[in-house]
Amino acid sequence: MELMLLFAKLPEAYSIFDPLVDVLPVIPVLFLALAFVWQASVGFR
């Protein structure tokens, strides 16, 4: 029973990370853009 109470409190404990979780899906897009900029700088060899 105490374990279920602990799990119920977990989302509140992690609420400070909500902005971070909102940003995380954008990171792969940034890597794609970085790869494109890198290829443009070396002239698409």
From Swiss-Prot:
Protein's GO biological process? photosynthesis
Q: Which UniProt keywords apply?
A: Membrane, Photosynthesis, Photosystem II, Reaction center, Thylakoid, Transmembrane, Transmembrane helix
Task: Please give the superkingdom of this protein's source.
Answer: Bacteria
> What is the membrane topology listed in the Swiss-Prot or TrEMBL record?
Single-pass membrane protein
Q: Which Pfam families match?
A: PsbK
Give the stretches traversing the membrane.
24-44
Protein name (database record): Photosystem II reaction center protein K
Q: Which SUPFAM superfamilies match?
A: Photosystem II reaction center protein K, PsbK (SSF161037)
The organism named in the record is Cyanothece sp. (strain PCC 7425 / ATCC 29141)
Q: Does the keyword Transmembrane apply?
A: yes
User: Function, please?
Assistant: One of the components of the core complex of photosystem II (PSII). PSII is a light-driven water:plastoquinone oxidoreductase that uses light energy to abstract electrons from H(2)O, generating O(2) and a proton gradient subsequently used for ATP formation. It consists of a core antenna complex that captures photons, and an electron transfer chain that converts photonic excitation into a charge separation.
